[in-house]
């Protein structure tokens, strides 16, 4: 098409004549036409034949394209070993894409023994030729210290080279460096600018982080609608945390019309990827049965998945199910195990319920000191029932030294929150004190 009207059929005709004479450049170009169906009927088998003829004459671009065909099994039986062999031939001639793909093979052990140092060497060669993906991967190696001494400043330098070419992943990683001040002076506006560039190219992690900034209003004008829009874009690409966040937005009507169906959809997508918070929230929905038909068995299944990942709230709710035999066979020891796990993570309700069991000796050896310890942990978080029960322990001297002043203090804290039992207990003590004073001699 240089200085002459573009004519694909004519080009194919001329490439064919030249290819028959053994010209590797013509064989390569004709192969591309056959592979893509440009100016001639698509024929991948013919393309492979021509790539092979050209590659056998040492043409590095043909070696590379043929390697890709072997790697993907396009028009030829998949053969990673053969692909590596061809990438190597092409890479040795300095072809940047071949160097990069060969580095990927060495990095992951595809068709060849894993060798991170060799991968770094090849990323370096490709990166020096300006190949953005190689620059990015090399930057990751420097950031992590994989196959090369850790060097954050070098990583930033390489991320910058790649990002300046518009590579979305590099823009994102560079943004993270600017936001955290890693290997470069902290610069939040620059980070936001790079997150935006990356997000605009559809990179899900950038969309998610940018959404977080819009949601919280950190370093950017708060815009909940924009946040939801970006969460959704990220979620639709399978970002599990974005799926969870957009589900929360739909469930509560934050920045979007309340839509329980969509909330459940995104909770489910996130839960299926193992997000413990999504599993827990979805379990609550099935457990309560307010928004969908109640399904306690499904709830228990989801609580279990979440609890197994250490979610304290799920551990507590699952403990309740085992305690009551709700959706699962009653199992007090299992309930105690789950209460304990949840309580250790600071769940005040688990601390309280476990304290009750120790106080009463239900399913566990009675231990009033342990009960007081757990009531205290829960009460310190402001839980009124725990404050009331702890006050009772201080009043009676059960599991702790008797201390009426402390009891009054705790009853008062609970009563302020509207705890009726605490109000009655406080009144009882004060009435008793008042009565004692009346009986005292004047």
Language-model features and meaning:
Residues 1-2, 15, 21-23, 36-38, ...:
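Short helix-capping/linker turns of helical repeat alpha-solenoids
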Residues 29-36, 65-72, 101-108, 137-144, ...:
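Hydrophobic face of amphipathic alpha-helices that form TPR/SEL1-like repeat modules
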Residues 50, 86, 122, 194, ...:
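Alpha-helical repeat scaffolds
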Residues 402-420, 427-430:
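TPR/TPR-like (Sel1-like) alpha-helical repeat modules
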Residues 421-442:
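Terminal, low-structured helical/coil segments at or just beyond the last alpha-helical repeat
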């Amino acid at each position: 098409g240089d200085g002459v009207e573009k004519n694909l059929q004519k080009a194919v005709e001329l490439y064919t004549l030249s290819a028959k004479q053994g010209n590797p450049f013509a064989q390569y170009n004709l192969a591309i036409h056959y592979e893509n169906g440009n100016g001639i009927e698509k024929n991948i088998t013919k393309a492979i034949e021509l790539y092979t003829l050209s590659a056998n004459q040492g043409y590095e671009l043909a070696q590379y394209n043929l390697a890709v065909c072997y790697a993907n099994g396009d028009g030829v039986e998949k053969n990673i070993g053969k692909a590596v062999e061809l990438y190597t031939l092409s890479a040795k001639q300095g072809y940047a894409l071949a160097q990069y793909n060969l580095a990927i093979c060495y990095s992951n052990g595809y068709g060849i023994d894993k060798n991170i140092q060799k991968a770094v060497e090849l990323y370096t060669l490709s990166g020096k030729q300006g190949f953005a993906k190689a620059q990015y991967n090399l930057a990751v190696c420097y950031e992590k210290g994989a196959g090369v001494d850790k060097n954050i400043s070098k990583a930033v330098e390489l991320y910058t080279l790649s990002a300046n070419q518009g590579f979305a992943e590099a823009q994102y990683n560079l943004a993270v460096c600017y936001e955290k001040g890693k290997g470069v002076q902290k610069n939040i506006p620059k980070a936001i600018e790079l997150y935006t560039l990356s997000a605009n190219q559809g990179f899900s992690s950038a969309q998610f982080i940018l959404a977080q900034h819009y949601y919280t209003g950190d370093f950017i004008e708060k815009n909940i609608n924009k946040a939801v829009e970006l969460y959704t874009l990220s979620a639709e690409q399978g970002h599990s945390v974005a799926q969870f966040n957009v589900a929360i937005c739909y469930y509560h009507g934050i920045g979007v019309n309340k839509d329980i169906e969509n909330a459940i959809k995104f909770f489910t997508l996130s839960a299926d990827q193992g997000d413990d918070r999504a599993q827990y929230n979805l379990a609550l929905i099935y457990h309560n049965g307010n928004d969908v038909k109640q399904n306690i068995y499904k709830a228990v299944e989801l609580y279990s998945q979440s609890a197994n990942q250490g979610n304290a709230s799920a551990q507590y709710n699952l403990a309740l199910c085992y305690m009551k035999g709700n959706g699962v066979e009653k199992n007090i020891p299992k309930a105690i195990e789950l209460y304990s796990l949840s309580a250790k993570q600071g769940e005040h309700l688990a601390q309280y319920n476990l304290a009750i069991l120790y106080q009463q000796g239900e399913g566990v050896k009675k231990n009033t000191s342990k009960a007081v310890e757990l009531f205290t942990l829960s009460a310190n978080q402001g839980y009124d029932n725990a404050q009331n029960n702890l006050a009772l322990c201080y009043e009676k001297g059960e599991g702790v030294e008797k201390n009426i002043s402390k009891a009054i203090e705790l009853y008062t804290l609970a009563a302020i929150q509207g705890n009726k039992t605490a109000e009655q207990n406080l009144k009882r003590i004060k009435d008793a004190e008042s009565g004692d004073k009346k009986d005292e001699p004047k």
